[in-house]
Amino acid sequence: MVFRSPPTIIYGKGTVTSVGEQAARFGKKAVLVCGKGSLRKSGVLDIIVSSLEKAGVSCAVYDRVGSDPTTSDVDEGAAFAKENGCDVIVAAGGGSPLDAAKGIGMLLTNGGKVTDYEKTAPEKESLPIIAIPTTAGTGSEATRYSVITDTDRNIKMLLSTDGIIPKVAILDFAITKSLPPFMTAATGMDALTHAIESYINVNASPITKMYSLEAIRLISKSLIPAVLDGRNEQAREDMLLAALYAGIAICSAPTALVHSMSRPLGAWFHIPHGLANAMLLSTVMEYNRQSCPEKFRDIAIAMGENVEGLSVRESSIAAVEAIAAIADETGLPKLLSSQGVTEDKIPTLAKDAFAAGSTANNPRVPTVEEIETIYKSIF
């Protein structure tokens, strides 16, 4: 088994101010990749720029990444960074800016367009990336993946290579406290999905399972408190750590059927990734439960469920019910139809999901018809 994680992880309240010192290890001019407004509004952008300047690192801000990074975002970002002579990347925000930054970094050292690397591995490592997550969800600060939307084909491309793992991950839970309840819930359910899918993954190892279970434990304890009170520092700290742990886990034991099914929902109907996962998670887990009930018993225990006296089967059911209960408590929408999904598109969604690489990681390999049935059950 191969285990991967970022070389350097800096953790703690206020650590965002260390970005300048870290960037100076790799270069003299940074491209700061971020979203279209939230980082500036929160004041975090100014903190990052100030830290860079104090360390003698100049900065060009690329703030054009949307909620789902597109091929254009990446190609244009690489051109912007090249024009500005950037030699290090700082990515700050949710999973979208972090994923875009990985694609940008890869193009700066390998050339071409991002679509060139959909099925072809890049020869060179990305430009050094320093990742600063402001949401507790994707764990992109720890992974070898970048999900980019190709709007011409209505698909989400998965880039997968060790060369885009960030060199430094900076985890400052204080900068996540302003995240609104909906985003807290959706990104938190994304992290929970990562943790669960990596644990039941056919490629899971003792190391990845350790990270997965701890992520499940922390999320079960702290997601709802973070949704209800964004200023709850302990909950925010737990969630940011959980997202990191789950990201480390999926870096070596990747996502499975939930992600195969959620990506087409994002590509065709622009449903936020975390929300799509939240709607699918308990239903897909019920589908998977019979294939590895012992692992589901472990999940139930990690979630704090009392399984004493229960059979393995009963314990596995308790796990699925606990997952569904957390999704209910977040208040997130449950039905695909509420997000604009049309029933006539389900066969296309199912074919796209079946063809996705994550499906092969699932403990129970589905048919296209079974995937259609799952979609229809939450329509």
Predicted regions, residues:
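Glycine/threonine-rich beta-strand-loop-alpha-helix active-site module
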Residues: 72-174
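Gly/Pro-rich interdomain helix-loop hinge
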Residues: 268-345
